[in-house]
A protein has these predicted regions:
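Active-site region of glycoside hydrolase catalytic domains
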Residues: 1-185
Length: 185
């Protein structure tokens, strides 16, 4: 819960509830700004929809003194790849941080709906990367079964969330065109 408070609550709790999550206040104290009543009123419920970029989910464990970057040290959490039992969260894509976890999106959509009064949600980016294999033939590149499986799984999770009553209004796939913005602005 602490990790999701820092990931989503940091932005959404002030809009919906007028303040940061308690777990953030406990760890960051006066480093977090406070909102006046006028500011709270100005931002409260002033949201038309949530745009959600989602690529992966991670396993998180409590660590008193995590070795990871400062952001995780403050949260006292650490990202882990597998439980002690050896169970992994999902298959890894090309990036070390990206695992294929369709059920994670389903769980997140239901969490957002429950905590934030079922706002309209547009999944503004969802997808995976793959290794850049210059030796692959066109036939091999077009036989992209991992990506097909990724989208089938994630779209099925979105469909299930909609059946659960989550107000998902749109879904956009992460494509090669999205990455032009990094180099070509």
């Amino acid at each position: 819960q602490r990790r999701i408070d820092f990931q989503f609550g940091w932005f959404l709790d002030p809009i919906y509830f007028g303040d940061y999550p308690e777990s953030m206040r406990e760890r960051l104290g006066s480093d977090l700004p406070t909102f006046s009543e006028k500011e709270k009123e100005f931002i409260r419920n002033k949201i038309d929809f949530i745009g959600l970029n989602h690529y992966t989910s991670r396993l998180i464990a409590h660590r008193q003194n995590p070795e990871d970057v400062y952001f995780y040290q403050v949260q006292q959490v650490e990202r882990i790849e597998k439980w002690n039992s050896g169970e992994k969260i999902g298959e890894r894509a090309a990036s070390e941080w990206l695992f294929i976890v369709p059920w994670g999106l389903h769980k997140l959509l239901n969490y957002i709906a429950k905590k934030y009064d079922n706002p309209a949600i547009y999944i503004t980016e969802n997808g995976m990367d793959e290794e850049d294999d210059q030796s692959a033939t066109l036939e091999q590149v077009l036989n992209d079964t991992t990506r097909v499986g990724y989208f089938k799984g994630y779209l099925a999770s979105v469909a299930q969330a909609i059946k659960d009553g989550v107000d998902v209004r749109g879904y956009f796939a992460w494509s090669f065109l999205d990455n032009f913005e990094w180099a070509m602005g």
